[in-house]
């Protein structure tokens, strides 16, 4: 399908953003669950993995697995193009698919007859998602960009037999949400194809080579020897599925619901792509969120009367049910696609609006890794992260610097978070440079076609800080124009941008729909005057400091950068760098990652993050006391990307004549402070930044004296809030808090995908004194053990200076640690046992595990 570009992003334009295509055929009006027309089956379990030392070992292991058609090991121009792509492909870019990718030749039996080989005997059992790099020893030779963690080459194998629900004439494909990176896939010794990019999903047809009555062996080789400038992880780190359909079926990513609004009338006009669709007819229904019919069967288009709009507070999702009948009128395929109805616009003078309501994008940039999990992140862990960011006041996420996962976008759709979905970092100057020319167009196509049904997405970023901006020639501009035009053909409803650094906005400002500024906010004022029709937003902002000059990043002042956005209507919003600590781009050794974000790896809010509560939620009562002092043992960040060192404790070194700075972040009108033998008058705090109290922050210098600092906040003359800093006693106990009263089991292998993802519990461990208050300044070794129907995914703190990311023990950090525990496939109970250095008895917590609903 080739779309003509319309005038995008006006108030009358409705985003055709919809939820991800759900491939499992749900019970409905057209078919029964007993005989599904299509299946999406869980394929995460029963995998084996082997990390190879070098290419020679890779070749040997693959040969022992019965494979003779080797992967391409080089990075030269002869490297293969990514294959087996799915979704809509423009005619001029079909060269990105190879013959090997679609499986040409006659099927044969299982390689080695399913017998154990020397290579397979050395493989370890793993389940997907899986990141092999995070479990490797820290190696300073690997460099700080990768978090000092190695990559290398790895091989996955999986032996499986088809379930009886798959009929003899069904088409069967394997789908990977992502695999990092340079994936080569074989089935029963036959190469199915390649997929080079490590951040997009891909599907490979297994039908020609399947052994339908016996065992099959799937083999995946990944090569992560090229380093990126942050931690990428390594492995099949997103979910895998079997896709089962009839010969005539809807393509994966093949439903695109086009929703428009003209003169107040909403219309849905779905576009459907079929495989072997000769003689087929397509019809649709629209269901509400409860499954009741909203629009009866139609083909072509239909009017949606008074739809319930998708908003940040009410992210309502409809269901588009698509049915395909063959020439005889027999139903051959059916699928449900969730979508949201909403409009948005960017304006050069007024910024951003959603459903006609002006608002600022209060955004955060996110890398996809999570602490000890690396990039293999269970859905529940990501849900907890995104919910915490929304509760903090964030309303938009930038997927830095790669396409987000389908599961991530599903969560944003249901929580009501907006998304800037990003294709690449650096273009040809980055780690992907050897493969960029042959694969980039297909990679962008995959991102847009697979994600355009998500109402959360409002912007496509075609690149970040691209090195081509430095070139004097027009290569970078022409590449941006090509990518921009491609995106608009695939989705004419969302704007594009390049996130630019060092004042290169002019180079791409006439190409993309929006102009992204990484820092350099002062330049935006001048650019708005020079180019009044451009639509501007801050794609990266410091978390604490503000820039001073137009073209110099390393010139800053201590001021909350949000107030620049708030004070300038033409700025659509900003995205903090970054929202949550991440591996790689490491702060000075011994830190193994970036540790200057509002949230640490455990998702505990830093005291410094209080800086943003009055800025992002000025209408909510808030008061927070912190101490700014270099006595606290914290990993420091990089230059002005870091926070000043702060903590919310009064357990600090005391000495005569020593003073410390107290900071009070508040939305109160005034605050009364109390200190032993001392008090001062009420201090008026105005609702906006003033010369007296900038950034809603009152600062005091107080003696470092044993006792208590108390602050009482007043609104309209009445006390409404209080906070205190108090000396705490010695560690006397442990508090264990679990975020889930119970868990559900993991889904069974080859079962229907979907259902509850509440299979991970987070247990917060807090050291407390005899009165139950947190003691932050007495670190203790904590050891955790898990028994029963659960496994310990990891134990960690907010300290990135640890020596590795495996094991069951860790030193507490400011009195805290976190456990992540996952259920198994069996019902029962999980018993968590925790011992603390210096405490005589262990502590226990029981978590019930229930069956899947």
Say what each PLM segment does.
Residues 145-252, 277, 417-420, 543, ...:
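Accessory beta-strand-rich segments of carbohydrate-active enzymes
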Residues 265-298, 320, 660-684, 708-713, ...:
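Beta-strand-rich binding/interaction modules
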Residues 39-59, 71, 179, 227, ...:
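Substrate-binding clefts and catalytic carboxylate motifs of secreted carbohydrate-active enzymes
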Residues 222, 280-283, 313-318, 659, ...:
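Short flexible loop/turn segments that cap and initiate beta-strands
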Residues 211, 271-347, 703, 715, ...:
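Extended acidic/polar, glycine-enriched regions
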């Amino acid at each position: 399908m080739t779309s003509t570009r319309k005038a995008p992003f006006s108030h009358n334009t409705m985003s055709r953003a919809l939820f991800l295509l759900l491939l499992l055929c749900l019970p409905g009006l057209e078919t029964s669950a007993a005989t599904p027309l299509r299946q999406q089956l869980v394929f995460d379990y029963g995998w084996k993995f082997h990390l190879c030392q070098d290419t020679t070992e890779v070749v040997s292991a693959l040969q022992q697995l019965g494979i003779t058609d080797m992967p391409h090991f080089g990075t030269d121009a002869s490297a293969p193009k990514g294959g087996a792509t799915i979704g809509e492909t423009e005619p001029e870019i079909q060269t990105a698919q190879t013959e090997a990718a679609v499986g040409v030749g006659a099927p044969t039996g299982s390689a080695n007859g399913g017998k154990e080989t020397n290579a397979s005997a050395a493989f370890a059992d793993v389940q997907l998602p899986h990141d092999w790099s995070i479990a490797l020893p820290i190696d300073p030779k690997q460099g700080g960009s990768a978090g000092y963690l190695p990559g290398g080459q790895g091989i996955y194998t999986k032996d499986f037999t088809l379930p009886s629900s798959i009929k003899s004439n069904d088409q069967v494909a394997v789908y990977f949400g992502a695999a990092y990176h340079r994936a080569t896939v074989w089935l029963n010794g036959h190469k199915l194809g390649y997929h080079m990019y490590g951040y997009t999903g891909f599907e490979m047809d297994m039908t020609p080579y399947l052994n339908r009555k016996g065992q099959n062996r799937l083999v995946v080789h990944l090569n992560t020897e090229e380093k990126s400038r942050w931690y990428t992880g390594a492995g099949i780190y997103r979910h895998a599925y079997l896709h089962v359909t009839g010969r005539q079926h809807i393509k994966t990513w093949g439903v695109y619901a086009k929703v428009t609004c003209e003169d107040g009338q909403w219309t849905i006009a779905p576009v459907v792509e079929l495989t072997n669709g000769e003689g087929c007819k397509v019809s649709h229904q629209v269901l509400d969120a409860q499954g009741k019919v909203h629009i009866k069967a139609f083909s072509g288009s239909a009017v949606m009367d008074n739809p319930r709009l998708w908003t940040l507070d009410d992210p309502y999702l409809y269901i588009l049910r698509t049915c395909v009948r063959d020439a005889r009128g027999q139903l051959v395929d059916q699928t449900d696609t969730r979508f949201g109805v909403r409009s948005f616009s960017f304006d050069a003078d007024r910024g951003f609006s959603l459903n006609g309501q002006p608002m600022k994008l209060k955004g955060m940039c996110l890398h996809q890794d999570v602490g000890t999990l690396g990039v293999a992140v269970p859905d529940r862990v990501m849900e907890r992260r995104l919910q915490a960011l929304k509760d903090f006041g964030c309303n938009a996420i930038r997927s830095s610097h790669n396409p987000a996962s389908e599961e991530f976008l599903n969560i944003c759709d249901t929580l009501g978070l907006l998304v800037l979905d990003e294709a690449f970092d650096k273009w040809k100057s980055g780690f992907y440079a050897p493969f960029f020319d042959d694969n980039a167009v297909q990679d962008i196509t995959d991102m847009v076609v697979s994600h355009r049904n998500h109402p959360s997405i409002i912007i496509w970023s075609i690149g970040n800080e691209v090195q081509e901006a430095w070139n004097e020639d027009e290569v970078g501009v022409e590449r941006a124009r090509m990518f921009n035009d491609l995106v608009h053909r695939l989705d004419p409803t969302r704007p594009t941008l390049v996130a630019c650094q060092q004042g290169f906005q002019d180079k791409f400002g006439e190409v993309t729909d929006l102009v992204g500024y990484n820092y350099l906010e002062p330049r935006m004022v001048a650019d708005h005057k020079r180019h009044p029709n451009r639509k501007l937003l801050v794609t990266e902002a410091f978390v604490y400091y503000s820039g001073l000059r137009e073209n110099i990043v390393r010139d800053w002042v201590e001021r909350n950068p949000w107030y620049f956005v708030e004070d300038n209507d033409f700025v659509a919003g900003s995205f903090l760098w970054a929202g949550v600590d991440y591996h790689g781009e490491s702060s000075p050794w011994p830190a193994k990652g970036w540790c200057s974000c509002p949230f640490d790896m455990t998702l505990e809010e830093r005291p410094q993050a209080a800086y943003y509560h009055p800025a992002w939620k000025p209408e909510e009562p808030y008061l927070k006391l912190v101490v700014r002092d270099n006595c606290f043992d914290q990993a420091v960040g990089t230059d002005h990307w870091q926070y000043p060192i702060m903590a919310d404790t009064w357990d600090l070194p005391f000495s005569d004549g020593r003073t410390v700075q107290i900071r009070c972040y508040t939305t109160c009108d005034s605050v009364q402070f109390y200190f032993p033998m001392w008090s001062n008058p009420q201090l008026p705090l105005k609702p906006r930044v003033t010369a007296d109290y900038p950034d809603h922050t009152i600062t005091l210098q107080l003696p470092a004296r044993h006792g208590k600092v108390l602050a009482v906040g007043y609104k309209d003359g009445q006390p409404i809030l209080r906070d205190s800093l108090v000396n705490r006693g010695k560690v006397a106990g442990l508090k264990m808090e679990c975020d889930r009263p119970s868990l559900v089991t993991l889904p069974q292998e080859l079962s229907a995908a979907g259902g509850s993802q509440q299979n991970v519990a987070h247990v917060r461990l807090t050291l407390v004194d005899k009165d139950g208050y947190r003691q932050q300044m007495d670190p203790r070794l904590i050891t955790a053990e898990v028994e029963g129907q659960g496994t310990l995914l990891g134990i960690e703190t907010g300290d990135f200076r640890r020596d590795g990311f495996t094991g069951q023990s860790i030193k507490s950090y400011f009195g805290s640690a976190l456990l992540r525990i996952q259920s198994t496939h069996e019902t029962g109970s999980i018993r968590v046992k925790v011992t603390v250095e210096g405490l005589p008895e262990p502590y226990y917590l029981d978590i019930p595990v229930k069956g899947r609903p």
